Amino acid sequence: MSGAAARGDRLVGTWLLVICFMIFGMVVGGGHARTIGAGFVIQTWQPFTGIVPPLTHAAWERAFGLYKATAQYQAMQPKMTLAQFQSLYLPMFLDRDWGRLMAVVFLVPLAVFRLRGRISNRLTAWLLFLFGLGAGEATMGWYMTYEGMTSRILQPSPLYLGPHFVLAMLIFTAMLWTALTLRNPEPAILPGLARLRGLLSVSIGLIIATIGLGALVAASGALKVYNTFPLMDGHALPPHALAMHPLWLNFLANKATVQFEHRVAATVTAIVVVIAAAMGLRAPVGAKARDLFLLLAGLVSLQYILGMSTLVSGMAELGYVHELNAVLLLAACIACRHALRGATAAVPLPVYEMKAAE
């Protein structure tokens, strides 16, 4: 690859890293809006024209009037003032505008890079596919809001929030991997580390699955059902964990079961990631990769401590920090896995042994 082509790929990779940062920003904004209960406060859906918040007192009163008609307001917020409504409205509004900005930051550079021949047909198709997934992600978010406009539910459904978050993490994973590959196109050959590479792949899948279960806990209000650790009020498996019918409904809607699932998944994930980090720190992976494994070890330890603290305290705000650190943990695991993409199963024989074998 020529120097100019390599610089072009690095530039495209840097742009995709910006998109990854913006996806993380969506998690920051969306998680904050959910934590403060702002998911249903905006009762209009204007993806192209709603880029400016209400600017006059009359406009604010109209927006507040729409919210007053919702079941959430009538059941949970009947004494809310206009000032309180504004404090909820603006974080949700900024989250929506951040999504609009992300679409612009993605599509405009994509068109420019394409017109200048900086990206291939294959990469263009791949990025458009990821954009399509992002559009599906936005549609899923819209539907959760739409439910609050048209039905009597009081908060976004965990059955939508869980897949919504998982899809976001899958997009984040694919985007980050693509960015890292463009910035570092030549994998380092690392003999004998194929098992570690596979363990990191498993770790990525476990982290994403655990994040999805965490979203179920947050959306269903399961955080405060049991606030002891490691047992759940003295029980390994909580009573009534399988009380709902049909049986499968317990794993999605039973608060005790949902919290139990997340506890088990988090513990298994932490063990697997710690093993992967320990193997990486002992392996001949190079200084840069070693730093990544150190970061991975630190983040998984912090994540488990945050999870335990969130459970014991019952604080949704601490759970929000736990959620953000989960994305950082996922990013670190992806970076470690990417650094080992040139790992092979066999360790090559020394030259003299190869000659003797001949």
Curated annotation (Swiss-Prot):
The chain crosses the membrane at residues 11-31, 98-117, 123-143, 159-179, 199-219, 264-284, 292-312, 315-335. It is an enzyme of class 1 (oxidoreductase). Pfam families: COX15-CtaA. Its cofactor is heme b. Keywords: Cell membrane, Heme biosynthesis, Iron, Membrane, Metal-binding, Oxidoreductase, Transmembrane, Transmembrane helix. It is a multi-pass membrane protein. GO terms for cellular component: plasma membrane. Its EC number is 1.17.99.9. GO terms for biological process: heme A biosynthetic process. Its main location: membrane. It comes from the Bacteria. Pathway: Porphyrin-containing compound metabolism; heme A biosynthesis; heme A from heme O: step 1/1. Belongs to the COX15/CtaA family. Type 2 subfamily. PANTHER family: CYTOCHROME C OXIDASE ASSEMBLY PROTEIN COX15, CYTOCHROME C OXIDASE ASSEMBLY PROTEIN COX15 HOMOLOG. HAMAP family: HemeA_synth_type2. Interacts with CtaB. This is Heme A synthase 1. The gene is ctaA1.
